[in-house]
UniProtKB/Swiss-Prot annotation:
Expressed in cotyledons, hypocotyls, leaves, shoots, flowers, stems, siliques, hydatodes, trichome bases and guard cells. Not detected in roots, mature brown siliques or mature dry seeds. Pfam families: Caleosin (PF05042). This is Probable peroxygenase 3. Residues 57-92 form the EF-hand domain. One of its GO terms (cellular component) is monolayer-surrounded lipid storage body. The modification Phosphoserine is found at residue 220. The gene is PXG3. It comes from Arabidopsis thaliana.
Length: 236
């Protein structure tokens, strides 16, 4: 019969990968119930109540992630709104068109309220949980809630150079480590999403911080960057 130490072990001697990709066992010291999926907020060990001042507007965390691109707050993100969002984030026109086509083509149909495709490629925020794909970090659950422990595990497993920060190589390792068998759409989507986030939010030393990743999950990162850019333009 296994003792308490073995029952709570997070590494297995015959599975070296469990030692290479460590998970934390101290999260409850600073984050209540880190295993419990949160519907409205995206907390971590430094922000146990989520993003201060960020209004969920009653949306799930996954819906909040997308809502930045909904320019007129009608619950639908059309390609021209996605394009405007990317421009507000600082992407040039060509890359904004590219990312817009990729995102709306990939996620429009699965979020539609009917089986009939729409040539306008709208993404319906109400149904964004249906756009969850495989080979991701599982920080969103299948209903669009946010699971704090899985955010923390990303960084305990892969942030080996600087605590709570990912280099580009480590971002790549995240996408490789999350790969599931026979899931090419998930492999590609996961890599595109993480590389896009790295391009958007890496710091001057080339690292992607846990705070930036957390802000991406609840959309507050997008709001912050767009606001900073708008203020900068006013000062010019």
């Amino acid at each position: 019969m296994a003792g308490e130490a073995e029952a709570l072990a997070t590494t297995a001697p015959l599975a070296p990968v469990t030692s290479q990709r460590k998970v934390r066992n101290d999260l409850e010291e600073t984050l209540p119930k880190p295993y419990m999926a949160r519907a409205l907020a995206a907390p971590d060990t430094e922000h146990p109540n989520g993003t201060e001042g960020h209004d969920s507007k009653g949306m799930s965390v996954m819906q909040q992630h997308v809502a930045f691109f909904d320019q007129n707050d009608d619950g639908i993100v059309y390609p021209w709104e996605t394009y405007k969002g990317f421009r507000d984030l600082g992407f040039n026109p060509i890359s904004s068109i590219f990312w817009t086509l990729l995102i709306n083509l990939a996620f429009s149909y699965v979020t539609l309220p009917s089986w009939v495709p729409s040539p306008l490629l709208p993404v319906y925020i109400d149904n964004i949980h249906k756009a969850k794909h495989g080979s991701d970090s599982s920080t969103y659950d299948t209903e669009g809630r946010y699971v704090p422990v899985n955010l923390e595990n990303i960084f305990s497993k892969y942030a080996l150079t600087v605590k709570d920060k990912l280099s580009f190589k480590e971002v790549w390792n995240v996408t490789e480590g999350n790969r599931m068998a026979i899931d090419p759409f998930g492999w590609l989507s996961n890599k595109v999403e993480w590389i896009l986030l790295y391009i958007l939010a890496k710091d001057e030393d080339g690292f992607l911080s846990k705070e930036a990743v957390r802000g991406c999950f609840d959309g507050s990162l997008f709001e912050q960057i767009a606001k900073e850019r708008a203020n900068s333009r006013k000062q010019d």
